[in-house]
């Protein structure tokens, strides 16, 4: 929905062009893409900002359109994207290559990384407005370059090679951290403009106060009223419309864990304001400052915050009297004495202990609660006394949960249940109001923002499906088509959530069923980067260049493009450009004979192709039509346990072996077989597993094969392989493991180039 235009008489061609643009922009507003979206401005106001020289932002525009459509598809299917925030452009490219459809870019990693002008630090959005867009520009540039490199290499392939080589989608589907917008409406617009100019299609804006912004999992968060958050969202949409980009706006709320707000002006926030119900208690501010001053007077000069304020003597006297009666001054004296005697306690430590006791005492003595809770207490008391009440307490709570302070007070007076209540008494020294944070407040904030955003995000203090469901159901009760996002934060200790491994594995899937389409590990890349660096640095110190050799072996195993780094970064395409620009006269190609990359093309391990050749012989003998393909990969990413899979032409897995190569104390290589399967009955008892084991023994130079928790099939197979001469001995130890010793002379015979012995093994002539 947008504000309707009034008819304007058109005279000149200039005005006619302007009105055409206004009409086109209005049609754009009215398109299905923006169904349910409210704009607080007109198409005319947008066009007035554009000027006459067209400026195109094709990367952001095309990415935004395609990304939004994909998110809508996922929402309809109740599925989701699970992603993380990369710490480098290489990580972003790898994510897309590994099939993660979208990328998150957070201010946490930007803060932790620092820049040429900013020190690394915590996530307080204290960096310049341009810093996250600058980080985003590097990611987008890396993705576009990866796309160009891929396109060039695919052009050099035959049609058959292209069909066998997957093409990766490097479009910059990114949702980036716009923090609080970094100020007022002009700052929000400037920030969004910078994101669009570098090609970013999505942005999240939160409802924290600029200047006091915290990471979503730090304390001390101060919210802004709902109307202020809506202004930010509207300003972002306004800038996107000016730039003709259907960007994806995510409205984040921190209301679940916040306890402060900088204004009581918005009616939607008022049900959650906390106030004193005992009005003879000195204000929270005066008591807090009097406590600080007491520390100062007792010689702790570092605690001097009271000097910022000009509290009157009478206020200090009233607050001091209350602190004395509550025993807080006594606690201050005890803490200061202990600090002097101990010498080891920090000033922050002794202050925090006393402050916690003060807060609990003040809240208790002031009867701190929301106005709705105060009225409910009056109604419940009247009900318990048998007095007639005009509304049941539960009915009142339902009403008060959405009522403004004005409406709630009017209703309470009508019921004869208007208790004393004052939120001004509970204000902090900085002037912030105290609020009742929690999921109900986060729901209220998100419902207010929903018509102005494409996706809603409630920041949470832990990972909890029940909390997510409560939020999703409340939002979808009023906005059934509203897409949601969820922070799978590394700030959570996932092993303290009470979830099993399987529940953690399925957590993103369960979120998708609730309508959470974009679920992300905010600074996952930062932790990946750190742990990988620690592991490699340790290995380098312990094992010298063997550490790098092991890394290169792993790259070959998983067929990582990092195995050929010059190609990865675009060496062949660069040489092609050099040839084009020099009329093919250049003799300085980077990928020529002098490139050490050719060393990485040398086959240092037994190739999978050898087993595929054996399987072709085997298939021919048994007249099987499928052309079999061999895949060797870690069973799970990062695992030392490997899986060798045999696949048919339709990519169905026909057989597999789960195993781990290990070395014993004497340096002998042992294959530890955990599981093996032949999935098609028609493939069994044809020595398929024998061929697979022969190749594994050859590939890993194994001296023995151990079968863990073996089955009867394992017993039969190993005895048959012994009869074929592949094993010299087969022993079963205590029923839990089969130990088979490899017969290397027989292995050598089976590996001879003429393949006579191998063919006899396949055809069962031997």
Curated annotation (Swiss-Prot):
Name of the featured protein: Isocitrate lyase 2
EC class name: lyase
Cofactor needs: Mg(2+)
Phenotype upon loss of function: Deletion of icl2 has a little effect on replication in media containing glycerol, glucose, short-chain fatty acids or long-chain fatty acids. Cells lacking icl2 have no discernible impact on the kinetics of M.tuberculosis growth and persistence. However deletion of both icl1 and icl2 eliminates growth on fatty acids but has little effect on use of carbohydrates. Cells lacking both genes are incapable of growth in mice and are rapidly eliminated from the lungs and spleen.
A Pfam family reported for this protein in Swiss-Prot or TrEMBL: ICL
Organism, as annotated: Mycobacterium tuberculosis (strain CDC 1551 / Oshkosh)
Enzyme Commission code(s) on record: 4.1.3.1
Entry keyword tRNA-binding: no
Listed PROSITE patterns: ISOCITRATE_LYASE
GO terms classed as biological process: glyoxylate cycle; tricarboxylic acid cycle
PANTHER family associated with the record: BIFUNCTIONAL GLYOXYLATE CYCLE PROTEIN (PTHR21631:SF3), ISOCITRATE LYASE/MALATE SYNTHASE (PTHR21631)
Molecular function GO labels: isocitrate lyase activity; metal ion binding
SUPFAM superfamilies: Phosphoenolpyruvate/pyruvate domain (SSF51621)
Regulation: Inhibited by itaconate, itaconic anhydride, bromopyruvate and 3-nitropropionate (3-NP), when M.tuberculosis grows on fatty acids, but not on glucose. Succinate at 5 mM inhibits the activity to approximately 50%.
Biological role: Involved in the persistence and virulence of M.tuberculosis. Catalyzes the reversible formation of succinate and glyoxylate from isocitrate, a key step of the glyoxylate cycle, which operates as an anaplerotic route for replenishing the tricarboxylic acid cycle during growth on fatty acid substrates.
Annotated binding of substrate, by residue: 106-108, 216-217, 252, 487-491, 522
The keyword Transferase is annotated on this UniProt entry: no
């Amino acid at each position: 929905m947008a504000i309707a235009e009034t008819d304007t008489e058109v005279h000149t061609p200039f005005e006619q062009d302007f009105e055409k643009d206004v009409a086109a922009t209005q049609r754009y507003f009215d398109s299905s893409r923006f169904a349910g979206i409210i704009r607080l401005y007109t198409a005319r106001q947008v066009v007035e900002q554009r000027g006459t020289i067209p400026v195109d932002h094709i990367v952001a525009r095309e990415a935004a359109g395609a990304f939004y459509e994909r998110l809508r598809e996922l929402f309809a299917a109740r599925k989701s994207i699970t992603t993380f925030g990369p710490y480098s452009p290489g990580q972003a490219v790898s994510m897309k290559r590994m099939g993660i459809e979208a990328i998150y870019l957070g201010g946490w990693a930007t803060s932790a990384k620092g820049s040429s002008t900013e020190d690394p630090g915590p996530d307080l959005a204290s960096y310049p407005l341009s810093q996250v867009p600058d980080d985003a520009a590097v990611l987008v540039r890396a993705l576009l370059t990866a796309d160009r490199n891929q396109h060039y290499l695919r052009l050099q392939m035959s049609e058959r090679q292209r069909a066998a080589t997957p093409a990766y989608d490097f479009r910059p589907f990114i949702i980036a951290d716009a923090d609080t917008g970094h100020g007022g409406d002009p700052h929000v617009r400037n920030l969004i403009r910078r994101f669009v100019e570098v090609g970013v299609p999505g942005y999240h804006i939160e409802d924290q106060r600029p200047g006091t912004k915290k990471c979503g999992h730090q304390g001390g968060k101060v919210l802004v009223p709902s109307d202020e958050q809506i202004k930010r969202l509207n300003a972002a949409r306004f800038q996107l419309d000016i730039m003709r980009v259907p960007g994806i706006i995510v409205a984040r709320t921190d209301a679940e864990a916040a306890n402060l707000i900088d204004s009581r002006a918005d009616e939607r926030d008022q049900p959650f304001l906390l106030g004193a119900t005992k009005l003879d208690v000195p204000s929270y501010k005066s008591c807090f400052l009097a406590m600080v001053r007491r520390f100062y007077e007792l010689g702790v000069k570092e605690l001097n915050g009271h000097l910022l304020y000009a509290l009157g003597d009478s206020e200090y006297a009233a607050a001091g009297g209350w602190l004395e009666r509550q025993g807080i001054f006594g606690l201050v004296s005890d803490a200061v004495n202990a600090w002097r005697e101990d010498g080891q306690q920090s000033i922050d430590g002794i202050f925090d202990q006393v402050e916690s006791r003060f807060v609990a005492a003040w809240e208790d003595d002031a009867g701190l609660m929301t106005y709705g809770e105060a009225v409910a207490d009056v109604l419940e008391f009247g009900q318990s006394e048998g007095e007639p009440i005009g509304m049941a307490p539960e009915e009142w709570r339902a009403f008060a949960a959405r009522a403004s302070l004005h409406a709630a007070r009017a209703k309470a007076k009508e019921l004869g249940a208007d208790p004393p209540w004052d939120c001004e008494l509970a204000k902090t020294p900085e002037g912030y109001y105290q609020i009742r944070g929690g999921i109900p407040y986060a729901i209220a904030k998100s419902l207010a923002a929903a018509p102005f955003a494409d996706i809603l995000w409630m920041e949470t203090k832990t990972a909890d499906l029940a909390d997510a469901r409560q939020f999703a159901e409340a939002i979808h009760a009023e906005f059934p088509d509203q897409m949601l996002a969820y922070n799978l934060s590394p700030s959570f200790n996932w092993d303290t959530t009470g979830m099993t491994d399987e529940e953690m594995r399925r957590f993103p899937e369960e979120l998708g069923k609730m309508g959470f389409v974009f679920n992300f590990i905010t600074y996952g890349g930062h932790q990946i980067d750190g742990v990988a660096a620690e592991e490699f640095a340790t290995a380098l110190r312990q094992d010298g260049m063997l550490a790098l050799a092991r890394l290169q072996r792993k790259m070959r195993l998983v067929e990582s493009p990092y195995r050929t780094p010059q190609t990865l970064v675009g060496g062949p395409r660069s040489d092609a450009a050099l040839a084009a620009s020099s009329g093919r006269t250049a003799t300085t190609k980077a990928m020529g004979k002098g490139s050490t990359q050719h060393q990485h093309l040398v086959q240092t391990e037994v190739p999978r192709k050898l087993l595929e050749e054996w399987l072709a012989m085997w298939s021919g003998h048994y007249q099987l039509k499928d052309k079999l393909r061999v895949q060797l990969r870690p069973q799970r990413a990062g695992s030392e346990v490997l899986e060798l899979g045999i696949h048919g032409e339709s990519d169905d897995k026909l057989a597999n072996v789960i195993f781990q190569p290990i070395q014993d104390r004497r340096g002998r290589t042992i294959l530890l077989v955990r599981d093996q399967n032949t999935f098609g009955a028609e493939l069994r008892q044809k020595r398929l597993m024998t061929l697979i084991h022969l190749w594994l023994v050859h590939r890993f130079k194994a001296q023995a094969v151990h079968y863990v928790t073996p089955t009867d099939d394992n017993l039969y197979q190993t005895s048959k392989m012994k009869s074929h001469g592949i094993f010299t001995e087969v022993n079963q130890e205590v029923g839990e493991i089969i130990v088979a010793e490899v017969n290397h002379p027989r292995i050598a015979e089976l590996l001879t180039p003429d393949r006579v012995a191998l063919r006899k093994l396949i055809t069962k002539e031997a």
